[in-house]
Amino acid sequence: MNFNQDEIIKEVFEKKNQINSNTFTITRFILLTLLSYFIDGLQFRELKASLKISDGNIASNLLYLTKMGYINKNALEFDNKKLHYYTITENGKEELKKILNWMELIKKLLGETNNE
């Protein structure tokens, strides 16, 4: 291991502590990523089709992300039906950015390790 790898490892652990560890699950990461990409938001059924997991699993993860202030649940009336869709908040974008930066450090570390 060289000096650069030591610095990257140190930074990986420092950045990891900046991430809300309860948010960093694959499902929550994918939800935040999808909602950051689809800026107009997505409905529950659209998220379910993308993730292919149970309604309960999606619902509990959406509820958690809503309570944390990372996403908003919005209502829209269409043909006398109330439709709900989810959008990412600024806090959600910031948390996603922290996760992506942390993952980029790990990728950099793996690249350094493979180059030896």
Can you say where each PLM-predicted feature lies in the sequence?
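Amphipathic alpha-helical dimerization/coiled-coil segments
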Residues: 2, 10, 14-16, 93-116
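Canonical helix-turn-helix DNA-binding module
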Residues: 44-75, 80-82
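N-terminal helix-turn-helix DNA-binding core of bacterial DNA-binding proteins
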Residues: 14-57, 85
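Basic, amphipathic "hinge/linker" alpha-helix immediately C-terminal to the N-terminal HTH DNA-binding motif
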Residues: 78-99
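A cross-family signal for key residues in well-ordered alpha-helices
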Residues: 33, 66, 97
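Contiguous, function-dense segments enriched for cysteine-driven chemistry
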Residues: 11-13, 72-76, 87
